């Protein structure tokens, strides 16, 4: 039988501590050579409000209102500016497999996005065009022993947890053991998850500063997480104020414009960045130790062939050639920019922090093995707890030779 899970059941199946442990185990296997990932591939094709409205069967002048209201009804948020930038259809894939657990995972995302300028910064926005203001993004788990389809689940909960749990693993091995103060840029799901995951590996955290451009959002975020964690969490008025005088600096934004500046980082700080482009070159230059989740992620911007020539210029530039320059800090593990891989760090093949004064920098990029790690743990726990709905595996099999 093949198990079908929804996001509520996924959340019930696993704790954040289990996510951190599963990610750590997976990257140890990566370092040992017994787990694999494919590069994340994004494929971009222009679409439009007119085309979306026509397919949804509504007047185009009602599209924005419909989507924004449907999201607000779910206490979720879409930047209104997202509709003012050119719209792009994006199909994204990631793959990973772990020999030890016998799990292979494929993540597929079929979505509409745009890149508006919000508060002077280029943002990455996903627009929920599915029924009820929802997204279409799935994870399929396969047996790496028999090839059979084991489970299908949405990726929303795992998407957040695989990123923040990986960041927490980096923090566990790179941040100072006596870290007490955290600064966070962002007030969305990644920021909240980063608080939860960081507390798993550094339970002694006493003070957290938060900045995001929307004052209303950051105040609500701080209030919610202060109540949930019982920790001294405060909202501050600038990115600089959030990053000054902290032991752990976390970027959890959706911007491609540098907002975390190396000049603000004190000696001894650990930087955990979740979004390509949110840190400036000074962060890379000042770091004594740089670790990337997975090297191959740094090459995904070379994939010119996956952006249609007719795509808006901003998308072509962002997703093809922007970071190809040989002297770019995104050309990782070069003599100018030496970088370790997280798996090698965990497997003892690369050095981490050796001094309390060092600045360490975890470039927390994507790797498909994250989905195999968390997906496998969720499947294991869901079966034990009786979560989800089973359907016949026969539905997904064929007699013809593929």
Where are these regions (language model features)?
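Rossmann-like adenosine-cofactor binding region
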Residues: 230-325
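N-terminal Rossmann-fold NAD(P) dinucleotide-binding loop
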Residues: 191-192
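Adenosine-phosphate binding glycine-rich loop
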Residues: 7-10, 283-402
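Glycine-rich Rossmann-fold phosphate-binding loop(s) that bind the pyrophosphate
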Residues: 187-188
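NAD(P)-binding Rossmann-fold cofactor-contacting core
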Residues: 201-226
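Glycine-rich phosphate/pyrophosphate-binding beta-alpha loops
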Residues: 155-159, 273-279, 365-368
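N-terminal ligand-binding/catalytic initiation module
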Residues: 1-168, 178, 369-372, 389, ...
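Short helix-loop-beta connector
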Residues: 174-181, 204, 266-267
């Amino acid at each position: 039988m093949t198990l079908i899970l929804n996001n509520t059941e996924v959340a019930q199946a696993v704790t954040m501590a289990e996510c951190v442990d599963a990610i750590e185990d997976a990257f140890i296997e990566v370092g040992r050579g017994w787990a694999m990932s494919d590069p994340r591939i994004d494929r971009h094709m222009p679409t439009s409000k007119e085309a979306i409205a026509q397919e949804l069967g509504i007047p185009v002048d009602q599209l924005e209102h419909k989507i924004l209201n449907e999201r607000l009804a779910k206490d979720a948020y879409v930047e209104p500016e997202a509709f003012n930038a050119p719209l792009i259809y994006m199909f994204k894939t990631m793959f990973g497999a772990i020999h030890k657990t016998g799990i292979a995972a494929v993540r597929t995302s079929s979505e509409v996005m745009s890149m508006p300028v919000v508060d002077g910064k280029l943002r990455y926005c996903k627009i929920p065009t599915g029924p009820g203001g929802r997204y279409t993004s799935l994870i399929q788990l396969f047996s790496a022993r028999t090839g059979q389809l084991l489970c299908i689940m949405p990726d929303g909960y795992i998407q957040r947890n695989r990123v923040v749990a990986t960041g927490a693993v980096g923090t566990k091995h790179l941040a100072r053991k006596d870290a007490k103060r955290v600064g966070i840029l962002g007030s969305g799901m990644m920021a909240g998850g980063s608080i939860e995951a960081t507390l798993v590996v550094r339970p002694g955290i006493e003070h957290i500063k938060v900045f995001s451009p929307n004052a209303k959002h950051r105040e609500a975020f701080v209030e919610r997480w202060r109540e949930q964690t019982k920790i001294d969490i405060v909202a501050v008025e600038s990115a600089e104020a959030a990053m000054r005088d902290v032991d752990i600096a976390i970027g959890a934004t959706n911007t491609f414009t540098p907002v975390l500046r190396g000049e603000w980082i004190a000696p001894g700080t650990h930087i955990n960045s979740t979004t390509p482009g949110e840190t400036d070159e000074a962060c890379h230059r000042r770091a004594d130790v740089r670790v990337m989740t997975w090297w191959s992620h740094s090459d995904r911007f070379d994939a010119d062939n996956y952006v249609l020539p007719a795509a808006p210029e901003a998308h072509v530039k962002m997703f093809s050639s922007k970071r190809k320059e040989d002297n770019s800090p995104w050309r990782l593990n070069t003599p100018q920019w030496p970088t370790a891989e997280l798996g090698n760090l965990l497997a003892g093949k690369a050095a981490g922090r050796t001094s309390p004064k060092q600045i360490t920098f975890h470039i927390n990029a994507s790797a498909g093995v994250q989905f195999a790690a968390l997906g496998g743990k969720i499947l294991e726990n869901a079966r034990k707890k009786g979560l989800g709905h089973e359907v016949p595996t026969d539905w997904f099999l064929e007699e013809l030779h593929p």
